[in-house]
Amino acid sequence: MGIKNLKSLLLENKSLTILDDNLYKVYNGIFVDTMSIYIAVANCVRNLEELTTVFIKYVNGWVKKGGHVTLFIDRGSIKIKQDVRDKRRKYSKLTKDRKMLELEKCTSEIQNVTGFMEEEIKAEMQLKIDKLTFQIYLSDSDNIKISLNEILTHFNNNENVTLFYCDERDAEFVMCLEAKTHFSTTGEWPLIISTDQDTMLFASTDNHPKMIKNLTQLFKFVPSAEDNYLAKLTALVNGCDFFPGLYGASITPNNLNKIQLFSDFTIDNIVTSLAIKNYYRKTNSTVDVRNIVTFINDYANLDDVYSYVPPCQCTVQEFIFSALDEKWNNFKSSYLETVPLPCQLMYALEPRKEIDVSEVKTLSSYIDFENTKSDIDVIKSISSIFGYSNENCNTIVFGIYKDNLLLSINNSFYFNDSLLITNTKSDNIINIGY
């Protein structure tokens, strides 16, 4: 659940490390994202009785380690989650239909088991039937709520367990807010127990060490500013609970080493991070990039986004070119687009040295409005006259690609209003810089 791949990305970035759970016996309080853990337990058992027994056993075990356990429980409807709920219902129905077909098949097959080890085979198949039946039961969200509420009544009079209801707010969101308050008074984060990867986004906003646990693993998380940036970037690209992500892009452990990471989650930095491949503008659609980035920032920082209108999904191309439009349009306002490239270059370059009379004559000889083909030697000569170099540039100002004049950002990529070329795939580009 939550932000896809975030846990594996933070592990890859070395800020999240796996620890031996048995070595850590005592914590300064334990905060639990109840629904995520409840669902994780439910997926491992065969019936409500077993679910109740196992869940209570987990909570009692946490009490022994933390002294006090706070169960954060979702309650009420979250308006901005309607699209997420609709999508989950759709996938839940597909999963339920698939499991019902599987149940029918198992129920039919068990009748035909005979011969050697018949009882053992039937017992194994019956376990599978029981588990499928229970999973189908839990595919109804009302059944999940009813069964969870019934289990929670076992803790009503337990002074070591607090039931913290989160009205119209996600439990993991409220849990991390309360964890920050806990830290401000005790100087230490409580143990966070959750399977939702949004939790790691919320936990990345300060550099204090945290212990985070799911059902099977214990992690130590010591985030840097770069990890916070990575968490936000992953929420933006891969999607989170309230934003579906950038269609056509995904951050995975396999491509993480190609992505440039920063400390500040700014539009320029984000586009630089995304520029690990070439992109071409496919539509003229523009999106409100600032609104999307502000939403991700506010969500990660645990600001109250529940009154916001969440941004709509867009393609990675729409995001990138919408983000770059302002820079290109500012440049284009002082850019002669309809003349041959040598003339464009003379107009666009700001001299970095004095140009003498002989060089002016040379430049004049290059003005040919009838010749639409660009000569590489002419391009290099113009650059040199204006005080620029084409090789070993510390700062790249422009790139020339197939008679296109491209801007450069951070020496990381080149772009105009219709294409972006990463500097790792720039063999055919002439650099102009210093």
Curated annotation (Swiss-Prot):
The keyword Magnesium applies. Its cofactor is Mg(2+). It comes from the Viruses. One of its GO terms (molecular function) is nuclease activity. Mg(2+) 1 binds at D33, D74, E168, D170. Binds 2 magnesium ions per subunit. They probably participate in the reaction catalyzed by the enzyme. Mg(2+) 2 binds at D196, D198. Induction: Expressed in the early phase of the viral replicative cycle. Keywords: DNA damage, DNA repair, Early protein, Hydrolase, Magnesium, Metal-binding, Nuclease, Virion. Belongs to the XPG/RAD2 endonuclease family. FEN1 subfamily. This is Putative nuclease OPG089. It comes from Vaccinia virus (strain Copenhagen) (VACV). The gene is OPG089.
